[in-house]
Amino acid sequence: PEYKEKLQSLIKKLILDNNSYYTIDRVSNQTIKNILIDIMNNKSIKPLEVNGTKVFGAMDRAVYFNGKDGKVVVSMHSSRVANFETMNGENIKGWYTGDGMTYIYGKDSSAFTEFWPTVDDYHLPGVTNSLNPRGDKSGERRMIGFVSPKSFVGGVETGREAFVGMDMISWNKQTEMKKSWFMIDGVTLAIASNIDSRDGIIHTTVDNRILEDGKIYLDGKQLKEEITIQNPKNLSINFNENYPDENIGYKIVEAPEVVVKVTENKGSWKDIGGSSDKEITKKY
């Protein structure tokens, strides 16, 4: 009873926010469906307002809602939390999902639909990693004695702003770095510093998202083909999707090189440990 009203408000918000499909239509249990219908029809239940920041210290995660339908989630690991988990033959390529992967959500609730079977697992947004080939299920740091030796991972937040930091060493101890995120005033400032590696080519992926009909703009000019920019300063990259007022923007303050391109990725759930071998194609 103590949490009932808040949970009902959260449920209403989640159903209303889903612009991909109507959630209740996909609920087969009639008892649960009736409960959800009652919540949606009850005008005294208001959708939960979620804004600001939250650092989940016990699970090395940080979340930021900017009040304009933008959300940023940072996924990390440490001496307390595994870098990723694979079992029962599932998530066999989840290598970098806890290495600072940064999820950027806009208004489109289908933005990550069929993301995992089609994304290039060496180019996860927010991650700095080697391009050397990995074996399936390799590098899991979950069991006692195998977790990262780094404990300086987490952050502080006021409910409106947050500072998040990650002292990181790679699964094979060949790459070390410090990653920082400042979340304030509708902006997330991401910094990768003190990068030291002996593991071949190291790169950072700013974003890697399903495009559908979206367009990419560099300093106001629409991207027509793959482009490589040497030593960019204050480069603006903007992305819009299916909503006319939506814009997800990036500012590259400084970098040795930036590559921007559109690719067509193919894959199946079976490729990453699922059962379906149906080929899926997505534009990124």
Predicted regions and their residues:
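Extended polysaccharide-engagement surfaces of secreted carbohydrate-active enzymes
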Residues: E2-Y284
